[in-house]
Each structure stands twice: as C-alpha cells, then as structure tokens.
C-alpha cells in the first residue's frame, strides 16, 4: 500500500473532497518516494581509465563527483524543462489552488536543504555527489571517452549491486546513498512527474484545508524534484544507458567525513584537477571493504585494443599483487573491433 493510500485509509468511507479531518500526525508521514528506483537494473558497469582502476584497487573506494562538476554541469536543471512542459499540458487537470502551491518549484542550485530523508539532518544544507555507471558492459560510446590514437585505454568494472547499496544511510555522518537508472525519454520523465503530482493531489484533495498540509506538500515536492533531477538527462546522451549512485552529504560534514582502515583514518572529501578545474569529490568505500576478500567487483572488461593480451596479463599481475582477494572476478576483452 502506498503512503497516500495508508493516509487515506484513516478516513475510509468519507467524501474525498477535503472532508477527511486533518491531524498533525499526518505530517510525520512521507507522501512521496524520495527518488525513482528502477530495480530492473541488476548489473552496473563503471568505465574508468587505467589510473582510475588502479586507484579503485589500491583504496577500495569509488570517487563520487560533486554534481556541479559533472561533464555537463547543466544537467541537474534538465528537469526544469520537463516541469514546465508538464504544467503546460496538465495544469487544467488540477484545482488551481493546488497548482499554485507547487507549479513554480524548480531546481535553481547544486546545494539545498530540501532533502529530509536522513534522520536528525532534516533542513540541513546538502550537496550531491555522483558515481556514473552504465547498463552496457561493452559500449563503444563509453569506450570513446578513453580513446587515443585509435586505442581505447579504458576499463569497465562490473559493480556488485550491494557494493554501494542503495538506500544505505550512515546515521552518524548523515550521508545516504541512493541508486537508480537515468531517464532520457521525455515521455518517461513526464510519466514519472505525473505519478508524483497525482499522489500529492490525491492527498491534498482528500483532507480538509490546512496551511500545515500545504507547507508539507510544498516541501515534499521540492525535495522530490531536487533528488529526481539527478536522474533526468538530455535524450542525446541515451546511448550511455547510464545508471547512477548518488551520495547526499550534509555540507557542514564534508570536511570531517572519514573512514577507518587498519586503525588509520582517511579523509573522504578531496579535490582533483579535471581539465584545469579543481573538482571536489568524496571517496566512498565498498561495503565490506575491510574484509580479506572483496566482493564488490564481479568482472573487469578491457577496452578495444590491439594489445589486449598484454593488458590482460598486466591486469592479472596487478590483481595478484593486492593485499586482498577479488572473489571470482572475471576478466574479459571487448568484442568491438579496433579501427585505425
């Protein structure tokens, strides 16, 4: 049963037009899912450079990049065009008072305090950090990012689904990690927005008028838009078949975030230089990363290459040199032919 259905069941048998008595305990419930999760994506592949792969092996962490510094820094506001289109096409289907509550909600920045999913970090300013993966284990589109002189010097890591578990929350630091596939098609995006707006409208229409309920609906939709924006991309990128892990981090915790390995603390928030830009990121350790056997990486692919045999031999040597074991990790070569 959905959250709104549970809420409405409290007034079962009553007229749905603002007749259900409003009680403040309603405000403690979540009206919307915080994000759209597509659990059909069972395998996720992270494409990276040789240097990136070595860093992952050595530190047992993945780098999550600040959403403001992704390749297309404007992508977080892609949802705004979809919201504008949605209201243009659907405004007539809702009471104007409801429309006026949420019609103008948009993503305007990369840092906000809308995310209230984390216990005790409600209303805390947060930033979003992204790890990009693909659902395609041998994608020419993705290999091209690592192309030089006809060689594709990239590697593709199959990430075990629970390596960076979705809906994972560190209640001490306030960090949460969520996962979902990226939506490219406008029709799909419109359907996702429609489901969320309809759910809110059903609740708003059923309960008696209350300013507190109105404010709750505004907050819920603002929160939902802020997170969902990270999973909407322009249709021109659809060949990437992207799926994402997103870490949501309280801004005031960034400089103190750390993890412990062999009794030594490691800072999670750091910077690297990408195309001349100081780019912030956080290191996210694998689940169970402190064990002698690593389950996080299921396979490693080698990009299209004329010397793939040598790359495979070097990769095998590197894996054997690690101070932990990769459990049944398979190495495979791209089937895409090399062209010069």
Tell where the protein language model's regions lie, with residue ranges.
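Partner-binding and oligomerization surfaces adjacent to conserved cores of proteins
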Residues: 2-340
């Amino acid at each position: 049963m959905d959250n709104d259905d549970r809420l409405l069941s409290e007034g079962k048998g009553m007229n749905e037009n603002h007749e259900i008595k409003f009680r403040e305990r309603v405000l403690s419930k979540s009206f919307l899912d915080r994000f759209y999760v597509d659990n059909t994506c069972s395998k996720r592949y992270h494409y990276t450079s040789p240097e990136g792969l070595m860093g992952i092996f050595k530190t047992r962490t993945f780098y999550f990049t600040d959403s403001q510094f992704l390749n297309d820094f404007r992508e977080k506001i892609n949802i705004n065009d979809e919201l504008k289109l949605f209201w243009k096409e659907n405004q007539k289907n809702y009471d104007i008072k409801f429309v006026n509550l949420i019609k103008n909600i948009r993503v305007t920045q990369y840092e906000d305090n809308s995310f209230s999913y984390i216990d005790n970090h409600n209303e805390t300013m947060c930033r979003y950090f992204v790890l990009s993966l693909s659902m395609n284990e041998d994608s020419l589109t993705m290999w091209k990012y690592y192309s030089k002189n006809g060689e594709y010097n990239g590697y593709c890591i199959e990430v075990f689904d629970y390596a960076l578990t979705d809906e994972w929350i560190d209640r001490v630091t306030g960090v949460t990690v969520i996962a979902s596939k990226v939506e490219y098609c406008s029709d799909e995006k419109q359907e996702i927005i429609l489901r969320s707006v309809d759910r809110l409208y059903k609740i708003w229409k059923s309960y008696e008028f209350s300013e507190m309920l109105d404010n709750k609906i505004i907050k819920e939709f603002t929160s939902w838009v802020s997170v969902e924006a990270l999973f909407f991309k322009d249709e021109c990128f659809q060949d990437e078949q992207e799926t994402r892990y997103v870490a949501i981090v309280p801004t005031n915790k960034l400089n103190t975030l750390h993890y412990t390995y062999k009794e030594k603390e490691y800072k999670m928030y750091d910077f690297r230089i990408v195309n001349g830009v100081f780019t912030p990121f956080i290191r996210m350790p694998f689940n169970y990363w402190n064990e002698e056997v690593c389950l996080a990486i299921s396979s490693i692919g080698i990009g299209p290459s004329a010397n793939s045999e040598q790359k495979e031999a070097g990769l095998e040597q590197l894996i054997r040199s690690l101070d932990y074991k990769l459990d049944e990790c398979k190495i495979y070569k791209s089937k895409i032919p090399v062209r010069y």
